[in-house]
Regions:
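Acyl-CoA/ACP chain-elongation machinery
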Residues: 195-241, 274-288, 316-326, 342-392
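ACP-dependent fatty acid/polyketide chain-elongation machinery
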Residues: 1-77, 99, 120, 258-270, ...
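Flexible, low-complexity linker/loop segments at domain and module junctions
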Residues: 1-18, 104-111, 304-310, 341, ...
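Phosphate/pyrophosphate-binding loops at sites that engage ATP/ADP/AMP, CoA/4′-phosphopantetheine
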Residues: 95-110, 260-267, 296-313, 335-339
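Conserved small-residue
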Residues: 20, 38, 92, 116, ...
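Condensing-enzyme catalytic core mediating Claisen C-C bond formation in acyl metabolism
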Residues: 15-19, 43-46, 227-304, 312-313
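Short, well-ordered amphipathic alpha-helical segments that serve as non-catalytic structural scaffolds
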Residues: 88-99, 156, 183, 256, ...
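Conserved catalytic cysteine-centered active-site region
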Residues: 4, 8-13, 47-90, 96, ...
Length: 428
């Protein structure tokens, strides 16, 4: 056993299981439709004109949600929430029901043992921009009184907390594109430390706005393959040239194993470890060689009491940027060394686009599903793996995972140098 991998959680720490899953993405408005479309090679990317009706066209590639969350929630609730919070509510409601609570408010009892953690990247930015436009064109008297609540980064978390009556803590990590994964790391800590029996955790984002898209374009982060929307985002591909933005949410019900067993809950999988690091290299570029990512994966494995040889699957962050994908691949080579070819790697952002603060949570749901169904999801747009990547990347068809106990890692990275890795195991 490598000395960098210890024995996992300390004696007496409580195990965490996943009892509920929720998704809303460009492939579907819930978990079954999204998972089915992903395994079938679906892609939610399209050309979208974000321009004003009377103004010039502002056409970008994007992966808008398949289902408008405002049509799922009550009209009153939708009117009082930013779109990012709407996504969070829709996905959280599905996750809570999937966990065996038909009425979300019945989850909490008196609420003292239930917590919520929802990560965001840009949060209510689009609502802020809408209100700024109203201020400039109609005057201060037309600005919504909800402007301040919906612009706060904790808006989505607060709305989910209200829905389930959480009183053990409502938190909102803001760590760019690693925020959804960091939310799950916090949830694991709360379960282990005994601060909560149930944590509704995940990430959400609704930032498809021309200002955001123009900003990423100026950073040269977006794919310029406008004539081929379905093939534009190509994680790990030799011809990758940037990502496509998406929107949506992923939410999980993370529960202490003892609490889940006591109520006879179905268990989808186990959240066994988390690692959080920072590159401290550059605000918008990964450190060469991916040392921060490697350290996060090492930390997650150590936290889970695993060695690299026990991992069969990785759901990679893989945004399809030339530097980002290469650095992540180098990090995985560093961790798994000679055994890297035995690890089946999925890169799914070609289907969903990059959902920023929601990405880590959406991909955590996919990782749990992959272990549950023993199926690694495909990369819908992959044509040829970059030889410099050198990973066993799943192509355009799903890949079967081996028999026996399964364990996986999901990686997330974000501007500011954030790195988060989560370790999962199957329900057995």
């Amino acid at each position: 056993m490598s000395p960098r991998h210890a024995a996992g959680p300390a004696p007496g720490e409580r195990a965490a299981v996943v009892t509920g899953l929720g998704l809303t993405t460009s492939l579907g408005g819930d978990v079954p439709s999204t998972w089915r479309a992903l395994l079938d090679g679906g892609c939610g990317v399209e050309r979208v004109d974000f321009g004003e009706p009377a103004g010039p066209a502002q056409v970008y590639l994007a992966a808008p949600a398949a289902v408008d969350p405002g049509t799922v929630l009550s009209s009153a609730k939708a009117a009082h929430c930013d779109r990012s919070a709407q996504f969070a509510l829709v996905a959280a409601r599905e996750a809570v029901r999937d966990a065996g609570f038909p009425d979300p408010s019945a989850l909490a009892g008196d609420g003292s043992r239930v917590a919520v953690v929802v990560g965001v990247g840009l949060g209510g930015l689009t609502s802020v921009l809408e209100q700024d436009h109203r201020l400039r064109t109609q005057g201060a008297g037309r600005v919504s009184p909800r402007t301040i609540p919906v612009m706060l980064p904790n808006h989505a978390a607060a709305e989910v907390g209200l829905m389930v009556g959480a009183k053990a803590g409502v938190h909102a990590p803001v760590s760019a594109c690693a925020a959804g994964a960091e939310a799950l790391a916090q949830a694991l800590g709360m379960i282990r430390d005994g601060r909560a029996d149930i944590v509704v955790a995940g990430g959400t984002e609704a930032a498809l706005h021309p200002l955001v898209l123009a900003g990423f374009a100026r950073l040269r982060a977006l794919s310029r393959r406008h004539d081929d929307p379905k093939g534009a985002s190509r994680p790990f591909d030799a011809d990758r040239d940037g990502f496509v933005m998406g929107e949506g949410a992923g939410m999980l019900v993370v529960e202490s194993a003892a609490h889940a067993a006591a109520r006879g809950a179905r268990v989808h999988g186990r959240l066994t470890g988390a690692g959080i690091t920072n590159d401290s290299h550059h605000v918008a570029q990964p450190a060469p060689g991916g040392p921060g990512c490697a350290a996060a994966v090492d930390a997650a494995l150590r936290d889970a009491g695993l060695v690299p040889e026990q991992i069969q699957h990785v759901n990679a962050h893989a945004t399809a940027t030339p530097l980002g994908d290469l650095g992540e691949a180098q990090a995985l080579h560093s961790v798994f060394a000679k055994g890297v070819d035995d690890v089946t790697v999925s890169a799914t952002k070609g289907a969903f686009g990059h959902t920023l603060g929601a990405a880590g949570a959406i991909e955590a749901v996919l990782t749990v599903l992959a272990l549950r169904d023993r199926t690694a999801p495909p990369a819908c747009s992959l044509e040829r793996v970059d030889p410099a990547i050198g990973l066993n990347v799943v192509g355009r068809d799903p890949a079967a995972l081996p028999c026996g106990p399964l364990a996986a890692v999901s990686t997330s990275m974000g501007f500011g140098g954030h790195n988060v890795a989560l370790a999962f195991a199957d329900a057995s």
